[in-house]
């Protein structure tokens, strides 16, 4: 087989990594990847490999069985069920995103095992909430239902939650690491950087590799303090981490962030020197998404309260909320669209915003009253609709219900957001380099003591 034939075969194979897949949104993303792939990629040579992560082997095995069962059902409607089923492969991996040693170990296994990654869906997360302010929740739902079940103000979280020690170097050498920050942002950030060789090898026919950050509708820049980027002093560490996620993804292609983004996209180790005539592969594209408001277990509730929450979500949808997807399968709409669509489709979707001076878009899963889902642009505090100054430019965005108190983006606010993006990228790269050095030192120490 010639090199070109080999490359064509690899180009027909799609590899997608999904973190946090044992339940909820992550599991539904895996299921929907299968469904959408079998619908849109019908050639018998085209295949999909879904690499999913859980926190334990037991959870991984259980998730694998449930995904295989879903694949059998999805393939049953195909003209050749066995052939359709054979084109999809699941691979279970373990990782604890609050443990940087675990993240590094996963990265090494991925780089040794797979030829490329076409997309990584950074979904796993930690809420960090310890309870609910019930009087405030009941009053808010009774008097302002749609707003309170979209942007709730009644969740309780403590400040100062930190991870367990990452290394054996001791407290004098190892700085504190925020638990929610690490699980939601920094663990993924380290994983994406370490997987850069695979993302850069992506030769999928519809564009470069994709880093897809799963954020939240609740993210707002007011929750982020650049001097407390890990959210150790805030009582809203989850919202702070998701605001940071938004900022990193939306400002990744700006000139002001370029020095640090280039460092993030760099490959630490080149297994073979590149030939003089060989072009450097393009860096991945970074995308931002959220699942709308769906029923997951990220906020621990008893079953009666969980179903009461779903009932409130249904009522909010009937009252005109565009974001209450309710089911995690509908919530997976936008992440899967970003993972599998041709690059031209994504470019066309962003084009109206870029033509009007904007940039990256936060793509959210949206539902109408009948439950029909679609990916749509989400308004972001400080970034507006796709970074366009002024009112929404698309009719769909103008008609969509806004957050109460939302105002049109001003040029000054956009500049402030871009400057915040520059500072966040700088801090994140400094943290990554610091922790890579600490992990290297810990590994060297462990080897010397062995």
From Swiss-Prot:
Record bears the keyword NADP: yes
Gene Ontology molecular function: 3-beta-hydroxysteroid 3-dehydrogenase (NADP+) activity
Cellular component GO terms held in the UniProt record: endoplasmic reticulum membrane; lipid droplet
Domain of life: Eukaryota
Annotated compartments: Endoplasmic reticulum membrane; Lipid droplet
Binding sites annotated in the UniProt record for NADP(+): 25, 53, 59, 238, 242, 296
Family: Belongs to the short-chain dehydrogenases/reductases (SDR) family. ERG27 subfamily.
The protein, known as: 3-keto-steroid reductase erg27
């Amino acid at each position: 087989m010639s090199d070109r034939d080999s490359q064509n075969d690899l180009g027909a194979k799609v590899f997608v990594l999904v973190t946090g897949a044992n339940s909820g949104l992550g599991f539904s993303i895996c299921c929907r990847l299968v469904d959408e792939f079998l619908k849109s990629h019908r050639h018998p040579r085209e295949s999909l490999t879904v690499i999913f992560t859980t926190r334990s082997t037991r959870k991984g095995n259980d998730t694998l069985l449930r995904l295989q069962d879903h694949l059998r059902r999805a393939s049953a409607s195909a003209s050749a069920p066995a052939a359709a089923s054979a084109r999809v492969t699941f691979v279970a991996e373990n990782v604890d995103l609050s443990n940087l040693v675990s993240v590094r170990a996963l990265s090494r296994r991925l780089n040794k095992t797979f030829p490329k990654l076409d997309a990584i869906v950074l979904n796993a997360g930690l809420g960090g909430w310890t309870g609910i302010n019930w009087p405030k929740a009941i009053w808010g739902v009774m008097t302002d239902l749609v707003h309170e079940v979209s942007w709730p103000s009644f969740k309780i979280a403590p400040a100062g939650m930190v991870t367990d020690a990452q290394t054996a170097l001791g407290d004098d050498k190892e700085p504190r690491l925020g638990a929610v920050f690490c699980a939601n942002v920094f663990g993924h950030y380290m994983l994406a950087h370490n997987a850069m060789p695979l993302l850069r090898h992506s030769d999928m026919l519809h564009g470069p590799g994709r880093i897809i950050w799963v954020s939240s509708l609740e993210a707002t820049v007011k929750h982020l303090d650049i001097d407390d980027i890990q959210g150790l002093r805030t009582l809203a560490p989850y919202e702070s981490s998701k605001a940071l996620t938004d900022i990193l993804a939306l400002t990744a292609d700006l000139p002001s962030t370029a020095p640090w983004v280039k460092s993030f996209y760099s490959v630490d180790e080149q297994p073979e020197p590149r030939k003089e005539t060989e072009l450097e592969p393009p860096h991945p594209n970074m995308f931002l998404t959220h699942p709308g408001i769906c029923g997951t277990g990220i906020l621990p509730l008893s079953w009666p309260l969980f179903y009461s929450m779903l009932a409130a979500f249904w009522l909010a949808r009937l009252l005109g909320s565009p974001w209450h997807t309710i089911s995690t399968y509908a919530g997976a709409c936008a992440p899967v669209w970003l993972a599998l669509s041709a690059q031209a489709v994504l470019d066309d979707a962003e084009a109206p915003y870029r033509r009007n001076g904007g940039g990256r878009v936060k793509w959210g899963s949206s539902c109408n009253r009948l439950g029909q889902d679609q990916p749509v642009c989400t308004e972001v505090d400080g970034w507006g609709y796709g970074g366009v100054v002024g009112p929404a430019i698309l009719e769909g965005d103008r008609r969509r219900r806004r957050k109460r108190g939302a105002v049109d983006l001003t040029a000054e606010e956009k500049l402030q957001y871009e400057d915040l993006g520059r500072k966040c990228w700088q801090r994140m790269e400094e943290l990554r380099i610091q922790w890579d050095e600490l992990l290297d030192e810990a590994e060297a120490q462990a080897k010397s003591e062995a």
